[in-house]
Amino acid sequence: MARPKIPRRIECHPPASCFKPNGVPIRQLARVELAPDELEALRLVDQLGLQQQQAALQMQVSRQTLANLVKAARFKVVDCLLHQKALYIQAIDNKSSD
């Protein structure tokens, strides 16, 4: 049985929920889902330039959990860019955000 997911502090609320390659109809694209906590981890580490320990404290997760989130998110983003896939950002669960 999997452990219950600990609520994470998520401050990022993107204006769009889907990014896709230009000129390709959405129905023809494979779909990759990016979780809100993965996007928040990317924002803190890659956009704001925080160290992983600082970002983990801000999200209220362990440093290892943050590292796993960043790794998964980067893989998904690169996969979409290189293989022309649509990147969907999952809706934020109100229970897991501040």
UniProtKB/Swiss-Prot annotation:
A Pfam family per the record: DUF134
InterPro entries reported in the protein's UniProt record: UPF0251
Top-level division of the source organism's lineage: Bacteria
Similarity comment: Belongs to the UPF0251 family.
PANTHER family found in the cross-reference section: PTHR37478, UPF0251 PROTEIN TK0562
Protein's UniProt name: UPF0251 protein VC_A0091
Organism lineage string: Bacteria, Pseudomonadati, Pseudomonadota, Gammaproteobacteria, Vibrionales
